[in-house]
């Protein structure tokens, strides 16, 4: 008997919604990356996009352990000499919290065309509202130990 290889037409995509309130950033990112890749499905294949859509709400209330809010830095470069800009995660969490969550999750996806396609199914919102009610997303609970 041959091993089943899923076809792109066979993939059934579900919508998951994750509330990021008081969830540690790394644990949230790893669970979301697994859903985006489709590793929770019995027909997962590493070369086919079998993942689901993931909506993350309350990204501004995500938890960080240790002193990462003050010490961890977000860097971006304009491409010009002297164009490096750094911002602490605390400042970024106050102004643009979706950036921190998106970067953490996309860093756990493959760094190729397939990873970009999987990352496009990620929707992150800083507050509790989102425009995806029509898709009827299923709540996904992240189980974590006490902090």
From Swiss-Prot:
GO cellular component: cytosolic large ribosomal subunit
Tagged with keyword Isomerase: no
Keyword Ribonucleoprotein found: yes
Stretches the record annotates as Disordered: 126-147
InterPro entries reported for this sequence: Ribosomal_uL13 (IPR005822), Ribosomal_uL13_bac-type (IPR005823), Ribosomal_uL13_CS (IPR023563), Ribosomal_uL13_sf (IPR036899)
PANTHER family for the chain: LARGE RIBOSOMAL SUBUNIT PROTEIN UL13M, RIBOSOMAL PROTEIN L13
Function comment: This protein is one of the early assembly proteins of the 50S ribosomal subunit, although it is not seen to bind rRNA by itself. It is important during the early stages of 50S assembly.
Protein name: Large ribosomal subunit protein uL13
UniProt gene name: rplM
């Amino acid at each position: 008997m041959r091993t089943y290889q899923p076809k792109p037409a066979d993939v059934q995509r579900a919508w998951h919604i994750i509330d990021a309130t008081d969830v540690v950033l790394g644990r949230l990112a790893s669970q979301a990356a697994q859903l985006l890749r489709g590793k929770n499905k019995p027909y997962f294949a590493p070369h086919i996009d079998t993942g689901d859509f993931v909506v993350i709400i309350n990204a501004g209330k995500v938890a960080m352990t240790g002193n990462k809010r003050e010490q961890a830095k977000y860097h971006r470069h304009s491409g010009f000499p002297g164009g490096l800009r750094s911002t602490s995660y605390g400042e970024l969490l106050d102004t643009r919290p979706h950036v921190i969550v998106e970067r953490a999750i996309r860093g756990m996806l493959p760094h190729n065309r397939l990873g970009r396609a999987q990352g496009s199914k990620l929707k992150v919102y800083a507050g509790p509202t989102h425009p995806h009610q029509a898709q009827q997303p299923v709540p996904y609970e992240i189980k974590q130990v006490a902090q």
